[in-house]
């Protein structure tokens, strides 16, 4: 029985109760959200190391995903395992293995071993990889793709990205809508190239019921990928993007009827003035399915610092209702990220998600910020470290340049909170040291 099927029968599962406790909401709130398809809990029972269940969706905190995985040029399995550990250490709520080089099955197995949070994959990468190794990737058969999906389910993958909206009809819309950067989704591009070369429909769309059968068997959440997402501001919110979203909205309903959890992936390169519209359109067209976005990236020119630019767009999108942010790293658009890049990406996007939680009125986020302000006013450093999103970094910076006073070394004896409080408490004129 899937989480969705259990919820519809009125059952509160172990995972629902856990999510409710973590989120500070009632188990019934979570159950109702899962039953309605507004919340998903990616949870494949075959993922034995998964202990930190996550709820993604409306009424819950904004989540962050961290992508990792090998590439054609760089294959270092232990580095990818280290990336997974680093991502989880700094607060990633889920991780995705996007490996395209090396022994993909062995890499996935190693990452599953250390992933205490849900793990996602993009099965078409492996299906195309096998076909390319045999002859060329156009040689991939539909059966081969579904075989890979089944294998991922058996191994314990919790959610899979499937580019079901890249259909022949939507590719016609794309071809008649000139773009600056074309198709930038790797999985979507692979599927589109396969379809155009062979003149065949997307098997994930044509055989969607087969996909649902596999997903239901392993309770794999479907992350309906946006293969036609914009890859530049010039292409944002265009006809191809919206045409694909309309198709995805229809498939969300079919997944729900089949008892399969589904969330929807979104852009991408979107200017700030279009962020709200993109979130609202997605929610409207998909029956408020959880929205999992890449960024959003509000500028195309932040190469080397896309994690900062993406966090800006992600915070705004989260405020408007996006439910999970896929992080960007400093290496985005430039190369395969290192563990340090992963760390910086997770940090930036956890801050963005927290900012969105505050704006959405999340009670725990608001309370944490209130307590931090009180500790800061008291110059209670241990209290501040405990409440900081990243305590170790806060402590390191405080101790790196300490002060002779109780305050920090920026203001020292001139700390305004200290000075004014002293006067208000009747301590009178304070003697300040002369530098």
From Swiss-Prot:
Recorded source organism is Thermus thermophilus (strain ATCC 27634 / DSM 579 / HB8)
Functional summary from the UniProt entry: Catalyzes the synthesis of the hydroxymethylpyrimidine phosphate (HMP-P) moiety of thiamine from aminoimidazole ribotide (AIR) in a radical S-adenosyl-L-methionine (SAM)-dependent reaction.
Q: Which cysteines are joined by disulfide bonds?
A: none
Respond yes or no to whether keyword Transmembrane is given for this record: no
Q: Which GO terms describe its molecular function?
A: 4 iron, 4 sulfur cluster binding; carbon-carbon lyase activity; zinc ion binding
Co-factor: note: Binds 1 [4Fe-4S] cluster per subunit. The cluster is coordinated with 3 cysteines and an exchangeable S-adenosyl-L-methionine.
What's the name of the protein?
A: Phosphomethylpyrimidine synthase
Which residues are involved in binding [4Fe-4S] cluster?
408, 411, 415
User: By which gene is this protein encoded?
Assistant: thiC
InterPro entries assigned: ThiC (IPR037509), ThiC/Bza_core_dom (IPR038521), ThiC/BzaA/B (IPR002817)
């Amino acid at each position: 029985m899937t989480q969705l099927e259990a919820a519809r029968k009125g059952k509160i599962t172990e995972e629902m109760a856990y999510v409710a406790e973590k989120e500070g909401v009632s188990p019934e709130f979570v159950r109702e959200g899962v039953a309605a398809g507004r919340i998903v809990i990616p949870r494949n029972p075959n993922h034995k190391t998964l202990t930190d269940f996550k709820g993604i969706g409306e009424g819950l905190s904004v989540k962050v995903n961290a992508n990792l995985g090998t590439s054609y040029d760089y294959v270092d399995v232990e580095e990818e395992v280290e990336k997974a550990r680093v991502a989880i250490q700094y607060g990633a709520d889920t991780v995705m293995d996007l490996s395209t080089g090396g022994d993909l099955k062995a890499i996935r197995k190693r990452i599953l071993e250390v992933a205490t949070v849900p793990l996602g994959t993009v099965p078409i990468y492996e299906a195309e990889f096998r076909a390319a190794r045999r002859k060329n990737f156009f040689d991939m058969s539909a059966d081969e793709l579904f075989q890979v999906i089944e294998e991922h389910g058996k191994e314990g993958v919790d959610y899979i990205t499937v580019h079901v909206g890249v259909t022949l009809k939507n590719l016609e819309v794309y071809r008649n809508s000139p773009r600056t950067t074309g198709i930038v989704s790797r999985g979507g591009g692979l599927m589109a190239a396969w379809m155009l070369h062979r003149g065949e429909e997307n098997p994930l769309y044509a055989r969607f019921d087969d996909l649902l059968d596999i997903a239901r068997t392993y309770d794999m959440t479907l992350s309906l990928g946006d293969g036609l997402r914009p890859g530049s501001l010039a292409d944002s919110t265009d006809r191809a993007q919206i045409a694909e979203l309309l198709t995805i909205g229809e498939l969300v309903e079919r997944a729900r009827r089949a008892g399969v959890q589904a969330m929807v992936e979104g852009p991408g390169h979107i200017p700030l003035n279009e962020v709200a519209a993109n979130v609202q359109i997605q929610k409207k067209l998909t029956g408020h399915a959880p929205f999992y976005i890449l960024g959003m990236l509000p500028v195309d020119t932040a190469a080397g610092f896309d994690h900062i630019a993406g966090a800006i767009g992600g915070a705004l999108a989260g405020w408007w209702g996006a439910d999970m942010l896929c992080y960007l790293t400093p290496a985005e658009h430039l190369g395969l990220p290192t563990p340090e890049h992963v760390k910086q990406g997770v940090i930036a996007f956890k801050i963005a998600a927290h900012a969105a939680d505050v704006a959405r009125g999340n009670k725990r986020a608001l309370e944490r910020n209130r307590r931090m302000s009180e500790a800061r006013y008291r110059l209670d450093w241990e209290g501040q470290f405990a409440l900081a999103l990243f305590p170790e970094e806060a402590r390191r910076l405080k101790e790196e340049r300490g002060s002779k006073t109780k305050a920090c070394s920026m203001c020292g004896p001139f700390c305004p909170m200290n000075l004014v409080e002293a006067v208000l408490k009747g301590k009178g004129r304070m003697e300040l040291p002369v530098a």
